[in-house]
Amino acid sequence: MLTIENLNQSYGQSHILHNISFTAPEKACTCIIGRNGVGKTTLLKAVMGQVAAQAATLKYGNIDLLKQRPEKRPYHGIAYVPQGRQIFSQLTVEDNLKIGLPVHNKRSNERTRNVPEMIYELFPVLFDMKQRRGGDLSGGQQQQLAIGRALVLNPGLLILDEPTEGIQPNIVDDITKVIRRLNQEWGLTVLVVEQKLHLINLLADHFVLIERGHCVAKGKGDELTEELIQTYLSV
């Protein structure tokens, strides 16, 4: 379970997140929702330590994330798929996946473990294209690669920032099915920023609604009312 209490984040004089508090229950999917520019991505970056933030509590299970350096957080079972995918375009698909593996020989920077077979089972296209360069993949294939890379350390918490943004519909369906499978069959805790209402309805066991850096509503997925949708999500 991810527990956040009174999290605040500022850029200079701009206060971006205001006393955000919620829990992402274990083995459930929690959707962070809200219009563009309300602080959703900043919230995920704060959890991963990529932006400075202040909080009374920021814990994953019994691990105090406030005491963990950003580069150490993945080794405590937290995987993060950011916006933009951050694929290495000149590396092969296989080498992009291996980037997520721990270094066994620090002097040679050697990664001796193989890519877990379950990655290729989840995303068969990555096996078919594992010797192709990451830059040769379509946007949807790159997103599958980014998710696969996040999974190589077998995390307990998977954090995704708009994983279906700008992707062709057939791959959106594939990615959504994988997220549901990881959550429902494999028992991963999932925290996902999502904008598409039909996917929120499909994925969300719980939701957290952000508006101008404030948490204005939260609850179980079926408690996301039409009034909340019209007030905070409609364009």
Model-derived regions: residue spans:
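Helix-to-loop junction immediately C-terminal to a conserved catalytic motif
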Residues: 48
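Conserved ABC transporter NBD signature motif
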Residues: 56-64, 76, 112-116, 219
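ABC ATPase C-loop
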Residues: 150-151
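Conserved ABC ATPase signature
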Residues: 133-137
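Catalytic Walker B motif of ABC-type/P-loop ATPase nucleotide-binding domains
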Residues: 158-162
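The feature captures the beta-strand-to-loop junction immediately N-terminal to the Walker
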Residues: 33-35
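ABC-type ATPase nucleotide-binding domains, specifically the catalytic core motifs of the NBD
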Residues: 12, 68, 93-114, 122-124, ...
